């Protein structure tokens, strides 16, 4: 994505993360090391740190409300990647999947990293058997 972002001079296909540490920081760092820009959409909470140092300064945004932050994540998304995480990650993931399933959001590539984690957390087969998830909702499964 950063290569495409560089080709458009940072106008399209820009890496966007939650601006925090860990995997989010790695995404911003990768964009910076490639000479690109990246967006950080941070949430203002008493226990949260400041945005990571690799977010492009002019593209660092602080949100007080989760709903508005999620809206900004999803309205421009060309792909969604989700790594193992807690309740915040689950909330963002299921909101995005619901919006895609109900046609409120354009269908985009949706990639879950860490198959073993997701298979333990979500019983995909049980959802399909209960007709709550359809095979048309799922794409290729890769390890």
At which residue positions do the language-model features occur?
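Glycine-rich, charge-decorated loop segments at or immediately adjacent to ligand/cofactor-binding or catalytic sites
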Residues: 26, 118-129
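Glycine-rich beta-alpha loop segments
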Residues: 1-41
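Active-site/ligand-binding-proximal alpha/beta "capping" segment
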Residues: 64-111
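Alpha-helix termini
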Residues: 2-10, 100-104, 132
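Glycine-rich oxoanion-binding loops at beta->alpha junctions
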Residues: 46-75
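Short, acidic/small-residue loops that bind anionic groups at enzyme active sites
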Residues: 35-48, 83, 97-121
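Single conserved hydrophobic/aromatic residue that forms the stacking wall/gate
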Residues: 134-143
């Amino acid at each position: 994505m950063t290569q495409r972002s560089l080709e458009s001079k940072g106008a399209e296909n820009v890496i966007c993360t939650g601006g925090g540490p860990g995997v989010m920081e790695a995404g911003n760092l990768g964009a910076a090391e490639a000479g690109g820009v990246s967006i950080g959409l941070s949430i203002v909470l008493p226990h949260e740190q400041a945005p990571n140092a690799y977010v492009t300064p002019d593209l660092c945004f602080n949100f007080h409300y989760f709903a508005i932050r999620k809206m900004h994540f999803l309205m421009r998304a060309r792909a969604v990647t989700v790594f193992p995480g807690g309740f915040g990650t689950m909330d963002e993931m299921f909101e995005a999947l619901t919006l895609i399933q109900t046609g409120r959001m354009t269908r985009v590539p949706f990639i879950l990293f860490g198959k073993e984690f997701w298979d333990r957390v979500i019983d995909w087969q049980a959802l399909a058997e209960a007709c709550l998830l359809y095979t048309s909702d799922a794409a290729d499964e890769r390890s």
